[in-house]
Structures are given as C-alpha cells and as structure tokens.
C-alpha cells in the first residue's frame, strides 16, 4: 500500500452528496506565511461538492426550512443569486427531491450558469440591476415565490439567503467548529470576503461561543457591494 494511504479510509461512505459538505482541510499558504512571518492558512472550501463555501449555507437553509415545515415534498425552491449559492441550492434541492428555480444576473459567468443547469434547476436570467432597483434579481425571486404561493399555498420556498439566519447558522455550527478543532483552538485572526455576510457573522458567533479571542476581519474589494455600502451607504 502506498505510504500516503492507510488501512482506514480518510472519509466514511456517505449516503448523500449533502453529507460530503464541510470538513474541508486547512492548507498553509507557504509564500504568504514566509513573507509575513506568520502562519497563514486557507480553508479549502473549493473542495465542497458544489465547489464553494456556499454549499454549507444551501444545506442549512434547506434542512432548516424542512424542520420548520416551510419546505415540503413537491415544493419548488426559489432563490435570487449571483451564482455560487444557486449552485449549492440546486445541488441540495436535487438531492432532497425538490424542484429549483434560480434567478441570476445575466452578466454572471457561463460556468456558473452551466453548473446550475447541470443540477437540474431552472435558470432564469435577468438584467444585472442594483439592489435598490425593484427589478433586482433578489427582489424578483421574492415576487416569484409570493406569486406561486398565492396561486397554490406551499408551492414555493424562497431561500432568501441575505435575510435567512440559517445562512449564518451554517457557519456557526460547522465552519467555526472545524477551524477550532483543526487548530486546537489556537488562532489569532480570521478574515474572509462577504456576499451575504453569513460566513463572517457565523464564524464570529461560533468563535465567541467557544471562547476563542481571534480578531475578525472583513476583506472586500473596492467596488464590491458591502464596501460601497460601508463607505457610501449605497446598496
């Protein structure tokens, strides 16, 4: 047997693709660590089955909605997303037996659109408009779910990642504990970029709950939505 293998599997056999979400490794960033004199680690969220950290939120949103009776067999999962959350939701919806309709800005990459379609979701491309516009993709998703439920109660569930606390809970319950486990609780700081803010808020809450005193930092490029909101108040 090759030296890098053991007699025990690194991961047990899972019963569903959603069970493969999470438990991603921390990888030391060698050049960044050498240049700064610090140990800088990256959490390899690209190793989630849908290819991003958004798989965690997608799973938690769906399981939470099921537990609260908001998402029932035969319903359609609706969301407005710039891409990665849509991929995760399409994957989880397929695994759990739901139809899925994703509204996405038409400017998003072909690769994201193709991935959503490959999971069997219906993709609705809409103009890329700012959040303040009534035809922003998020607001269109909300109206679509509302119209479907008006015609048939319980026909649709709007994931609503930007306001759904299950998004944050995904990271409080999984991302933060994984980091603390793998580092034996020893870390000085955590940084991430944000879209909905779920990762930042959930990891910070998880660290606080565990008594970890790491500094929390938000890194957002100029021109990104949260940077614009922070500096100008524009959404």
Regions found by a protein language model. Name each.
Residues 1-235:
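PLP-dependent amino-acid enzyme catalytic core
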């Amino acid at each position: 047997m090759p030296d890098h293998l053991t007699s025990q599997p690194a991961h047990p056999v899972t019963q569903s693709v959603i069970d493969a979400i999470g438990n991603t490794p921390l990888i030391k960033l060698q050049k960044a660590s050498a240049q700064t004199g610090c140990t800088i680690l990256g959490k390899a969220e690209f190793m989630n089955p849908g290819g991003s950290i958004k798989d965690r939120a997608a799973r938690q949103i769906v399981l939470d909605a099921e537990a609260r009776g908001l998402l029932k067999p035969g319903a359609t999962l609706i969301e407005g997303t710039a891409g990665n959350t849509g991929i995760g939701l399409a994957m989880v919806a397929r695994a759990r037996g739901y139809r899925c309709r994703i509204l996405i800005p038409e400017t998003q990459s072909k690769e994201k659109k193709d991935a959503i379609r490959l999971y069997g979701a219906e993709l609705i491309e809409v103009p890329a408009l700012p959040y303040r516009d009534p035809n922003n993709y998020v607001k269109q998703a909300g109206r679509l779910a509302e119209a479907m439920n008006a015609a048939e109660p319980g026909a649709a569930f709007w994931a609503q990642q930007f306001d759904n606390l299950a998004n944050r809970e995904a990271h409080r319950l999984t991302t933060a504990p994984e980091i603390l486990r793998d580092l034996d609780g020893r870390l000085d700081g955590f940084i991430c970029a944000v879209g909905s803010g779920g990762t930042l808020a959930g990891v910070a809450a998880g660290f606080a709950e565990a008594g970890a005193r790491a500094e929390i930092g938000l890194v957002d490029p100029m021109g990104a939505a949260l940077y614009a909101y922070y500096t100008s108040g524009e959404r």
